[in-house]
Structure formats: C-alpha cells, structure tokens
C-alpha cells in the first residue's frame, strides 16, 4: 500500500517494523526472491531457473525482486 516499505501484517518479520510498515534500520528489504536476511542478494545469483528457451533470471544486487528474462544490468 502507499507509504509502506514492507508488509506489516507479519510481526515476525525481522526486517520490517510492524507498527510503522517501514524497514528496520540497516535493512534493504523484507521479502522477495532476491532478499536474504534483510539484504539484497548479490548481483548475478540465480533467483528463477530457466524454462524452455528463456535464460535463468538473476538478481540485480539492487532490488529484492527477481527480474524476468535474465536481465541483471
């Protein structure tokens, strides 16, 4: 939702302040295929295996999202 940095519906998430829906200090992310322990996964790490003719999708190192079609900057 607007203004939220993370999903405050899960108070057990150590990356997200459930009261404010903001990332905790030092956290880069709270969830996503390219987020691990509140930090972005390094650039080039496979986050989704190839299917058919499509290449593996890889983390960018700058986002918690896993981009489509293997583009990682």
Curated annotation (Swiss-Prot):
Coiled coil: none annotated. It is found in: Secreted. One of its GO terms (molecular function) is toxin activity. Residues 51-73 are annotated as: Disordered. GO terms for cellular component: extracellular region. InterPro entries: Disintegrin_CS, Disintegrin_dom, Disintegrin_dom_sf. Expressed by the venom gland. SMART domains: DISIN. Monomer (disintegrin). Belongs to the venom metalloproteinase (M12B) family. P-II subfamily. P-IIa sub-subfamily. The disintegrin belongs to the medium disintegrin subfamily. This is Disintegrin lachesin. It comes from Lachesis muta muta (Bushmaster).
């Amino acid at each position: 939702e607007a203004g939220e940095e993370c999903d405050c519906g899960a108070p057990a998430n150590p990356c997200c302040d459930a009261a404010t829906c903001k990332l905790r200090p030092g956290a880069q992310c709270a969830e996503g295929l390219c987020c691990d322990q509140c930090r972005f996964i390094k650039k080039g790490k496979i986050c989704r295996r190839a299917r058919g003719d499509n290449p593996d999708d890889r983390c960018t190192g700058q986002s918690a999202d896993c981009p489509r079609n293997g583009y990682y900057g």
